[in-house]
Amino acid sequence: RDYYASRGLGDVYKRQVPTLTIAGSDSSGGAGVQADLKTFSAIGTYGMSVITAVTAQNTEGVFAVEELSGEIIKSQIKAVFDDIEPAAVKIGMVSSPEIIVDIVNTIKKYNPSFLVVDPVMISKSGYSLLKPEAKENLIKYLIPMAYLVTPNVPEAEEITGIKINSVTDMKLAGEKILELGPKFVLMKGGHLDGDAVDVLIGENIFHVFKSKRLNRKNTHGTGCTISSAITAHLALGYDIKESVALSKKYITEAIEHSFDMGHGVGPVHHFYKFEESKIK
């Protein structure tokens, strides 16, 4: 915060804490950078973005992906950090090995306090968003520098090679990911049967978060949303356990208030709180 005070921006910082997402664009607005920015705003931080790829997608699927060049990605990161240093950073879709290396090398120069890595691999509709040859760089370079990694069950299975069918399996896989170097791992159990169970694992911490499973079809962008919600709460000064708990509550209510948009799997309602106040 001294950085802001030295530039005469102390009061601005208190009003709007800057947060950054580095991820792909979703043309339908439900996931990716669009979901991240909506989440940052809903929670009360100032959202900034670095686009890594442009996707042509809607509620029915992903139809095309075009990566941006490493040079423009690096330039975006530099432009943000050199002017508005983010209090926390979330990294989502990074599809190629070259892009991962470019991002890692650039981010290292700035060493953000909180780096949340959401290891996006496959879209909800089944479209592969991470090239097979990029997985090695994700594991070798990006995950080790993270403050928190937020894999779902299929992603954790891909990273660890462990088949996950229970909370015990989630713990084993999470501990294996923790060995790669991040400070914390949040294993998201939404793909398992029963209640929605997430497991937070770190040094001297093992906490199981349980919430009711909602019978809603509109869940497009839930993974992006919870990881960016955690990023925003960390930026606001909450500790890791509080950040996860508050973000679980936020995503649960956003799903509860989700609405039909398009012909497929619709988005969650990022601004449900404002809708409720408007109705009142």
Q: PLM features: residue spans?
A:
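Glycine-rich anion/phosphate-binding loops
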Residues: 27-31, 94-104, 129-132
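Short, small-residue alpha-helix embedded
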Residues: 34, 157-158, 216-240
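Short pre-catalytic strand/loop immediately N-terminal to key active-site residues, enriched for Gly-Thr
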Residues: 22-28, 206-220
